[in-house]
From Swiss-Prot:
Family: Belongs to the chorismate synthase family.
Cofactor note: Reduced FMN (FMNH(2)).
Residues reported in the UniProt entry to bind FMN: R128, S129, S130, Q247, A248, G292, K307, P308, I309, P310, T311, R333
Function: This reaction introduces a second double bond into the aromatic ring system.
PROSITE patterns: CHORISMATE_SYNTHASE_1, CHORISMATE_SYNTHASE_2
GO molecular function terms noted in the UniProt entry: chorismate synthase activity; FMN binding
Gene: aroC
A GO cellular component annotation in the UniProt record: cytosol
Protein name: Chorismate synthase
Binding site for NADP(+): R40, R46
Organism: Alkaliphilus metalliredigens (strain QYMF)
InterPro entries per UniProt: Chorismate_synth, Chorismate_synth_AroC_sf, Chorismate_synthase_CS
Cofactor(s), by name: FMNH2
EC class: lyase
Biological-process GO terms, alphabetical: amino acid biosynthetic process; aromatic amino acid family biosynthetic process; chorismate biosynthetic process
Amino acid sequence: MFRLLTAGESHGKSLVGVIEGFPANVKIDIEEINRDLGRRQRGYGRGGRMKIEKDRVEILSGVRGGKTLGSPISFLIENKDYANWEPYMNPEAVDGEEKRVTQPRPGHGDLTGTLKYGFDDIRNVLERSSARETAVRVAIGSLAKQLMREFHIEVYSHVTAIGSVSLGEPVENIEKIKRAEDSEVRCLDPEVEKAMIEEIKRAKEEGDSLGGIFEIHVTGVPRGLGSYVQWDHKLDAKLAHALMSIQAIKGVEVGCGFDQAQKKGSQVHDEIFFSQEKDYYRKTNYAGGIEGGMSNGENIHLRCAMKPIPTLYKPLRTVDIETKEAVLATVERSDSCAVPAASIVGEMVAITVIAQEFLKKFGSDSLEEIRKTWKSYTSI
């Protein structure tokens, strides 16, 4: 079983990832992982941290001579900013007072996490709850993406809304969606892109932040990933769970999602057709490629809503956990808008789930074994 763990604090020495159950004999391009880490760091609206960190992965185990061994893969991503934080984040002894935080930010896990674990310093919570953790999940997703490419499965994303500015009509043409890589905000329409950038500029000037919406498309997924036999085997449930675990994601839709609630069944269910050339196929994809908790052979289409980042340069009112007095929330260095970056994280989280379910279906010991099973199944 493909399992993963992440570890590390935002300003700690390194971030760490461990993957168990990754098949043997898969060629790994470490520079592709680094490129995906770089994609996560780009995007208009990112904060000053991205000028410090140039994320690169260092593989520690599980890969030899450019191929996976089938043993656990472990890696680290160095936090270059640790040099500035070492006195406050050293595992052995810290100068805690200077960077101690007692003013919880509304919208963050600051207050509840501090109360849950009995801390007197919110930094113990915010360092781990930070979205910096997603760098590890991007690296894991990049490995999963390279595995899935062996079976012609690819993943793409683009941003459809930032604040009040939205793209309008949905785009499902994959060649068009690929153009998101050329946009500062990963938007497919140059005029909408300009409006999004202006919206971010205004929010930044006001000391505020913006959320938005991004879409994920996974192509080439065979029928039958996931299952209807138990509630926790369903593919859409697993995808929603994983995507909702990304910091600041507050909603996930599959296919037409909430729009289906306002329509009749005849308007939202994808009719089934058959031909010798195409086998079973659909002319529409309202279901987003998943029916009954299983992939149905169409492209998987997901949509995620991201709330505005809770760290505001014009902070909201809160209560000091030490004095219990009314104060303004603490201000940590942060982004004004991270929706473009979140779309990359979403890609990687989605393809990781697809890889997990793919290996569950077709085996996981070695690439050769999986390929035989996959070919046998897809030739039926």
